[in-house]
């Protein structure tokens, strides 16, 4: 049914490259306006957020390039897999997003797509793109932290 369940959430899809390619500044939860066959396809655990992003057009937030495959039992009522989907946020949240995007060089990136209390939600991040050197620094920092933890584990076991 779903890939994992965390805190009452059934995660359908996650954008694993987003945390690698972007520095996450702030995270929002938004509802997604879907058609019936899209929900059925998501309940089967089929979706991809790779290369997807969100934009703000005329005061509305849209999820673009997210792939939800056609429902296999659907007929002529099936949806288009890569159509633009409206995200449901409060006006105040949209206004703060618009202000922050204008203020700095930020992007809206979906982190995960999940079911919460029977409704489809998307975890949307206000993020800044990382340069190659930033990615290398993060990898070096992670490797150093891993080595420290490994050494502490060895000392705790009395191996050194």
From Swiss-Prot:
Keywords: Cytoplasm, RNA-binding. One of its GO terms (cellular component) is cytosol. Disruption phenotype: Not essential for aerobic growth in vitro, has a 20% decrease in tmRNA levels. Increased sensitivity to antibiotics that inhibit translation (chloramphenicol and erythromycin) but not transcription (rifampicin). No change in sensitivity to pyrazinamide (PZA). Unlike smpB, the gene for tmRNA (ssr, 10Sa RNA) is essential. Strains with ssr or smpB disruptions are not more sensitive to pyrazinamide, suggesting the prodrug does not directly target either of these components of trans-translation. It is found in: Cytoplasm. Pfam families: SmpB. GO terms for molecular function: RNA binding. InterPro entries: SmpB, SsrA-bd_prot, SsrA-bd_prot_CS. PANTHER family: SSRA-BINDING PROTEIN (PTHR30308:SF2), TMRNA-BINDING COMPONENT OF TRANS-TRANSLATION TAGGING COMPLEX (PTHR30308). Belongs to the SmpB family. Required for rescue of stalled ribosomes mediated by trans-translation. Binds to transfer-messenger RNA (tmRNA), required for stable association of tmRNA with ribosomes. tmRNA and SmpB together mimic tRNA shape, replacing the anticodon stem-loop with SmpB. tmRNA is encoded by the ssrA gene; the 2 termini fold to resemble tRNA(Ala) and it encodes a 'tag peptide', a short internal open reading frame. During trans-translation Ala-aminoacylated tmRNA acts like a tRNA, entering the A-site of stalled ribosomes, displacing the stalled mRNA. This is SsrA-binding protein. It comes from Mycobacterium tuberculosis (strain ATCC 25618 / H37Rv). The gene is smpB.
